[in-house]
Amino acid sequence: MPGGLEKTCHQCISKIASNACFVVVLCAFLALPLSMTFIGMKFLEDCPIQPLIPLYLLVGGIVGTLKVSLLLYDSTRMRRLLSKAVVIDDDDDDEYPWRQNAHRYYIHLLLSLFLFLWFILGNYWVFSVYLPDFLPPFQQPQDYCDKTLYLFAVGVLALSHTVLVLLLLCSGCVYLCSRWRLAADED
């Protein structure tokens, strides 16, 4: 990545992450993994047809809470640094914090990778038993899944799909705009 583009991306991410609205959105977003954890724990034994659905919610909720908490910590730390008017010199090694704090960067990367793979597994587990019986059938009492648990899992996946599509669209727009801007600068 050219140095100018890297610096521009860093400045853009820094402005977004240090914005108070971003912190509020992260706090609101923390409700989803916490509710996933709660629903997963509450209904852990209530889906014998696919016992991995409550486990998907439980583990995804715990790891998601950890990920959002780390993002909140990083964002508030950046806000604190900016409020102290810390000016980073262009020649300073601290210009790109992810280079200096590589361990934190790799933790975020690993958590994101795990959550993405867990999301794929969750899709398989939830939709492999699409619309199960919500009450235990008399003949086969093991072929059911609690309605609240199942519909919550489907809702979480639908929300995740929506956010993923929006992120891909926004990333594509940013990429196209940056390419267009670079082409305009070269002319």
From Swiss-Prot:
It is found in: Membrane. It is a multi-pass membrane protein. InterPro entries: TMEM272. It comes from the Eukaryota. GO terms for cellular component: membrane. Keywords: Membrane, Transmembrane, Transmembrane helix. Its main location: membrane. The chain crosses the membrane at residues 21-41, 52-72, 107-127, 149-169. PANTHER family: SI:DKEY-19B23.12-RELATED, TRANSMEMBRANE PROTEIN 272. This is Transmembrane protein 272. It comes from Homo sapiens. The gene is TMEM272.
